[in-house]
């Protein structure tokens, strides 16, 4: 109950094709990784206006070198589907802003990005951080980058809530157990403040390790390691 159900729903479909538990566990992360790499290559091709095999290979290697992606696409966590959907949503957002004055195509990519984000939110609750960040940026930079009208933003919000109906309905009928777990039980001080701090510290160390290549490359770009 601590995660929305989309990953479980998709995995249940695999049951119709194979009863091999190892296949069931590995097939979805593998397919998701394939989708991400394909989108990455298409994105690279779109920016370069041609298929650059060298740049595409570098992009794939850099992606796989980031521990958090290697971990989540090797183990059957809900995160592999979350990453795939948000990656696809990001690409659609890129296409939305790149379409210039072609209003019809722009709206097509905007709503497709919203739809993919809604599915990501149906995979893990922390997808809301992506959506909140995108919305905050669009509202803050609206005069400079344009973006959807307030009417389309409201329509998109309604669309997101409609897609989350299964989660909302289940929580209403189960005393909001998912939200209670994330907002109360995980931070329950009866477990001890030291335990909460210990878990938070361990989480931060895990984040530093998981994103270590990004931090190192950023430091190098700022000439922190210019003498090494």
What are the residue ranges of the model-derived segments?
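Specific aromatic-rich, kink-prone transmembrane helix
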Residues: 39-42, 62, 81-100, 116-117
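Transmembrane-helix motifs of polytopic, lipid-linked glycan transferases
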Residues: 27-50, 88, 92
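Short helix- or helix-capping micro-motifs
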Residues: 56-67, 91, 117, 121, ...
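Membrane-interface alpha helices of multi-pass inner-membrane proteins
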Residues: 108-124, 160-161
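Membrane-interface transmembrane helices that cradle and orient dolichyl/undecaprenyl
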Residues: 45-53, 89-109, 217-226
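Short acidic/glycine- and proline-prone juxtamembrane loop motifs at membrane-interface regions
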Residues: 68-82
